[in-house]
Swiss-Prot record:
PROSITE patterns: ADENYLATE_KINASE (PS00113). It is an enzyme of class 2 (transferase). It comes from Mus musculus. Brain specific. Residues 162-193 are annotated as: NMP 1. GO terms for molecular function: adenylate kinase activity; ATP binding; nucleoside diphosphate kinase activity. Its EC number is 2.7.4.3, 2.7.4.6. ATP 2 binds at residues 386-391, 500, 545. This is Adenylate kinase isoenzyme 5. Monomer. Interacts with YWHAZ. It holds the Pfam family ADK. Its main location: cytoplasm.
Length: 562
């Protein structure tokens, strides 16, 4: 093969155009692994239909397309001159000047027809009117974004927008359009739709509903670049709801949805790719919104009604903080403010954590710590207020080398911090609502992990308060090895608490609080006791005697198990 044959082959196969596109992508993206990057690009070339479908900016991300040409635009021409055949009659395409950017028509149910460029210049919201509240709902594929978004919209009378559905409808209605045919291939392969196209569709939809008081947007943004574009072209959201769910659970839900609905992007290959994209993008996206104080994280690996209850509490707190509180916060006892069975992960202060440690899937970021935690001795010590739990826990912890954890104390400690979680708890309590038990469970888990290596076990006082709390503890951490119920009459507990209240000068307020707490305890404790009796983990101890007598009974119960 002579030189001209080689040049003719390169030109006929559009190899210069392919190489230029790959080089531009490498220079703009600067990947850590260029080999893997090139393999991914070549796979996309196949999916697009060959080298002739590739343009100079095919592998340049949207936000990087404004770079000036190298060497005044001459490098491209010199590159082509060196590889093109010398025969002037050879029919090759010249690219001395880039072709014009086509303006794609945007169609809608209201027969709106404008170019993408004009859409970008529009003010989405009327500046003379109050802007609607914007809630973004994000999470992995299959995390329940659509379900929860619809519930939020229905509860608050907001408009619901599914970005995925917007794109699917557009693809269906514009199937003959080359641009949307390419986007359909991208989505079917599990990749993200082009950023500017997606933003344009969202803006168009928002302009069709100017009178809404609030809007819930499901499935956007997917990465930080999209978040920045949304804020730049539309607005800063009022709240971002992040649904964290275990990776395996996401796969199971997607498989089930594929069987039921047959969505093209729920095929196995696309599902795997979407999960990879989510894992790569979620941590920095969550951290970005967290630094702006906009995001609340929820454990979505639960019943959808329980998840929605927690979301409602957060939305009320963040967007409607002026609702009248049923009780004054000074009347509230933090240890009694747990809402059994309702679990919320409000997130943590991630400022001091690496991105790869962020719990974006609802999985245990402590890794091996959780396995060690499940091997530890765990004892629940139940008893009403005034039964002597606190006193006995201190003595037992000293004797056996256990770590004593009080759920009420953990909650009070959290309230003294300045974390986003503490602010949410304080808002909930000031309104007189129940603190979701997921908050308490997360506090317990954090405290237990922090004590690993320095303890022989955990003695947990005041938990669980209802059966669902115990079930959730068992699922996420592990079942206790022993549950001790300190059996004490209401009269004895009342007398002890009254003596304590007199020493602290609480007077009649103390008496009112005592009656309320005892009533709540008796109402909740019976099913819990029955639950652990059936699991043969329960030991009852008579707590009517002196502290010494009760302590001996407790030691006997513990020694019989360990």
């Amino acid at each position: 093969m002579n030189t001209n044959d080689a040049k003719e082959y390169l030109a006929r196969r559009d190899i210069p155009q392919l190489f230029e596109s790959l080089l531009n992508g490498l220079m703009c993206s600067k990947p850590e692994d260029p080999i893997e990057y090139l393999e991914t690009c070549l796979q996309k070339v196949k999916e697009l239909g060959g080298c002739d479908k590739v343009k100079w900016d095919t592998f340049v991300s949207q936000e990087k397309k404004t770079l000036p040409p190298l060497n005044g635009g001459q490098s491209r021409r010199s590159f082509l001159r060196n590889v093109m055949p010398e025969n002037s009659n050879f029919p090759y395409r010249r690219y001395d000047r880039l072709p014009p950017i086509h303006q794609f028509s945007i169609e809608s149910d209201t027969d709106l027809s404008e170019t993408a460029e004009l859409i970008e210049e529009y003010e989405v919201f009327d500046p003379t009117r109050p802007r609607p509240k914007i809630i973004l709902v994000i999470g992995g594929p299959g995390s329940g974004k659509g379900t929860q978004s619809l519930k939020i919209a229905e509860r608050y009378g907001f408009q619901y927008i599914s970005v995925g559905e917007l794109l699917r409808k557009k693809i269906h209605s514009a199937s003959s359009n080359r641009k949307w045919s390419l986007i359909a291939k991208i989505i079917t392969n599990g990749e993200l739709a082009p950023q500017e196209t997606t933003i344009t569709e969202i803006k168009q939809k928002l302009m069709q509903i100017p009178d809404e008081e609030g809007i819930v947007i499901d499935g956007f943004p997917r990465d930080v670049a999209q978040a920045l574009s949304f804020e730049d072209q539309i607005c800063t959201p009022d709240l971002v709801v992040f649904l964290a769910c275990a990776n395996q659970r996401l796969k199971e839900r997607l498989q089930k949805r594929a069987e039921q609905q047959g969505r093209p992007d729920d095929n196995l290959k696309a599902t795997q790719r979407r999960l990879v994209n989510f894992k790569q993008n979620a941590a920095p996206l969550v951290k970005y919104f967290q630094e702006k104080g906009l995001i609340v994280t929820f454990d979505a690996d639960r019943d959808e009604d329980a998840v929605f209850h927690d979301i409602s509490v957060a939305v009320d707190s963040k967007l409607f903080p002026n609702k009248e509180a049923p009780m004054d916060s000074s009347d509230l006892d933090p240890s009694m403010m747990f809402d059994a069975g309702e679990i919320i992960d409000t997130g943590s202060d991630y400022d001091n954590q690496d991105d790869d440690q962020l719990n974006v899937f609802g999985e245990d970021t402590e890794g091996g710590f959780m396995e060690d935690l499940r091997k530890c001795k765990i004892i629940f010590l139940m008893g009403g207020p005034g039964s002597g739990k606190g006193t006995q826990c201190e003595k037992l912890a000293e004797k056996y080398g256990f770590t004593h954890l009080s759920t009420g104390e953990l909650l009070r400690q959290e309230l003294t911090s300045e974390s986003e979680r503490s602010k949410l708890i304080r808002d909930i309590m000031e309104r007189g609502d129940l603190v979701p038990s997921g908050v308490v469970l997360e506090l317990l888990k954090e405290a237990m992990v922090a004590s690993l290596g320095n303890t022989k076990g955990f003695l947990i006082d005041g938990y669980p308060r209802e059966v669902k709390q115990g079930e959730e503890f068992g699922r996420r951490i592990g079942d206790p090895h022993l549950v001790i119920c300190m059996d004490c009459s209401a009269d004895t507990m009342t007398n002890r608490l009254l003596q304590r209240s007199q020493s602290s000068q609480r007077g009649e307020d103390g008496a009112k609080s005592i009656a309320k707490r005892l009533e709540a305890y008796h109402r909740a404790s019976i099913p819990v006791v029955t639950y652990y009796e059936r699991k043969t983990q329960l030991r009852k101890v008579n707590a009517e005697g002196t502290p010494e007598q009760v302590f001996l009974q407790l030691c006997t119960a513990i020694d019989s198990v360990f």
